Design a protein with these regions (language model features):
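Winged helix-turn-helix DNA-binding recognition segment
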Residues: 22, 33-91
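Short recognition helix of helix-turn-helix/winged-helix DNA-binding domains
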Residues: 1-51, 81, 99-103
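Conserved segment of winged-helix/HTH DNA-binding domains
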Residues: 88-103
Length: 103
């Protein structure tokens, strides 16, 4: 883990200051967990819940709250399993492309 990565994680932790402890834990889990090329955490909710010591229902409910607040977004769906990734908002990425005048 580079110094830049540590700084980004600290900034993410600071940005989640208004959230509940469980919500922050879910956001940080998605920030720190290995991802696929698209940034998705390819792991079931039950396995992720076990990693942070939550029951699966509490984890799923908390993750739903985090999704609704815009911190996570659905990345992939395989059969009935949905995979999520941090949203551009969480990563501090500006996805709005400035308009330019037509020539």
């Amino acid at each position: 883990v580079t110094s830049d990565d540590k700084q980004k994680n600290l900034e993410l932790l600071q940005a989640t200051a208004g959230m509940t402890a469980n919500q922050r834990l879910v956001v940080m889990l998605y920030a720190l967990h290995p991802t696929d090329r698209g940034g998705a955490v390819v792991e079931t909710a039950a396995n992720l819940a076990a990693l942070v010591g939550m029951s699966a229902p509490v984890f799923s409910r908390t993750r739903k709250q985090v999704i609704e607040s815009g911190w996570l977004e659905e990345s992939d769906k395989l059969a009935h399993i949905r995979y999520y990734r941090l949203s551009p908002k969480a990563l501090g990425v500006n996805v709005v492309v400035p308009l330019r005048r037509a020539t």
